[in-house]
Amino acid sequence: LVGSEMCIRDRDIYDYIVVNLPGINKMLQSNPDVCIQKVDDQWLVAHSRLPDDRDFNISDLGYYTIPKLYGLMDTSSIDAVNATNITSQPFLNSKGQGVIVGIIDTGIDYLSENFCDTAGNTRIMAIWDQTLEYRQNLYVNYGRIYEQAEINTALEAYRNGLNPYDYVGTTDITGHGTFMAGVIASRKIDDYIGVAPEASIVCVKLKNAKKYLRDYFYIRDDAVCFEETDIMLAARFLKDYAGLKKMPLVIYMGLGSGLGSRTGGSPLSNVLDSLTMHVNTCVVVPAGNEAVKRTHFSGYASVVPEYKEMEINVERRGKGFVLEIWAKSLDVLSVSIISPTGEIIPRIPARIGSSTQYSFLLENSRIYVDYQITETVAGQEVIFMRFERPAEGLWKIDVYSLTNLPGYFNAWITLKELMDCDAYFLNSDADVTLVEPASGLRLITVGAYNHNTNGSDVNSSRGYTCLLYTSPSPR
């Protein structure tokens, strides 16, 4: 790390995702106003104030440079996975002995007996709480790491009527991380048992996303969401910890984002995918619950002057939402906009590196449009549109192809769990509704199961990826 822990946690400091190239790395290290953290051989996380000559938008900074925000995926009872039958087969040796389960989520209730062995000692090897004040350690540059011995001391204090948080001061306020840890690794208590009841646990409690990012993506005030940068660093920590302990590692991340190309090209997908190349390491992520939430649209954009009309209905006004339109392959697209009252913004030229703002006087709404002609990571054009205080009613986006052939495209809007208004596509497409990072080629992507009907949940997001692969891919 170059810099300090305060640089990382400061709410006025911006976080950036940077490609780890020798020239860029050297330039950043020589800048006293920048803190950097290495994620892996391909990616860095940088922390600094916004340069005076830059605006905070993807045209000035680059699409992948701005961290995307990830929300909690819905949870439901999965008793019907029949974990008891799985763990009771002695020849399978499938109770998780000698394996680390790494959980990236909202934390864990370490006081729960579900995470203790039969002797009453914790099976939690470590907790990295990113929200707490820094204490020096071997692994990370911010937050606090509690090791197994400290957790056992806190458990003993708790059993003796003392305050355990005087010893280990981390909690799971939402309970989401604890629930997921229980599904995966709870020991048998009464009639409940996790899938790997003897596995060791390492948990990362993510810090909340900074306000400037929540404002930029129009996130609902009460929504729980996290930065892509913190998740990338959490994955690196789990890899380093398991490597030092010389133990196999299974990472589970119960989070998802509605934005991204669905090609496996996002920085987080790339980081998680590269981890699976290590021996004895696999990564499990949720497919999401977007199939019937009407957050995806696809179609063919006709050659100018023809176009493909895309309709978004706003039923409840709020801060806003984000719309991304991804062209397939090397096609180039442009858009025009029609407001609910009929005000028209003519076709907006696809200018490289330009961010344009349009105001709608009758609606008291504003739309920001950014074009990235060749998005560096995924290799596709993305049109990034931010709808600020969109008026209720039907917004029409006309999509044009600037090449000689009709151009296929996908469009996604902000996850409903994070959106501050109620918006959806009128003619939505339930396919390719995977959340990011589920499109990673080597990630194990898990769909939702309805335990009441013993079948797939109708809400469960669907594939394929935009490269027409399954996840994990047989490639």
What are these regions (language model features)?
Residues 1-11, 469-474:
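Conserved small/polar residues in nucleotide/adenosyl-binding loops
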Residues 389-401:
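Noncatalytic modules at the cell exterior or secretory-pathway interfaces
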Residues 235-262, 286:
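Short acidic, glycine-rich surface-loop motifs adjacent to enzyme active sites
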Residues 268, 272-296:
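Catalytic cores of secreted or luminal carbohydrate-active enzymes
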Residues 89-227, 319, 330-331, 439-442, ...:
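Subtilisin-like serine protease catalytic core
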Residues 128-129, 133, 139-151, 278, ...:
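Extracellular S/T/G-rich loop segment that most often corresponds to the catalytic His/Ser-adjacent loop
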Residues 9-100, 107-123, 393-394, 433, ...:
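Autoinhibitory propeptides
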Residues 401-410:
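Short acidic/polar inter-strand loop motif in beta-rich domains
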